Amino acid sequence: MCQGIYYLINNQEVRSEFSNPRACLPVRIKGGALAQLPWGRRRQQAGNLPLGGWARLDAIYSGHWDRWRPLPVKLEIRQFMERDIEERHCWFDVTPGKWIQGLIAHWQQERRVYVVTITPEMDDALYERWPRILSDSVVPRT
């Protein structure tokens, strides 16, 4: 479910977990610059956007997020941390050339970014959810 992230911004390393109420995610904005936006919303945080830090892809497709004017974005994350079904933490590298999909949600002046997640297709998957990892280029089949 992507509980932690590692990225570089302005040549500074950032490692954070969702449990930190000040956690931000690196969003690639128009023009190529990186911006840091608040990662989701926690119970103790004021606001009207959804609680949590993740947006299920099937919920996006079903229109659940429409009321928050969702905007798909690229998250420039180098590593992410998942907690498996036995509560063990494991860090995973994001392959160069790939990126994690995010969603910016809006409510009046409030903006937060959520990690888009998918459900693993394998019956014996160790993780309940996985970040949606995409690529700018499509490799032709040979």
Regions found by a protein language model. Give the residues of each.
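Short linear sequence motif anchored by a di-proline
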Residues: 1-142
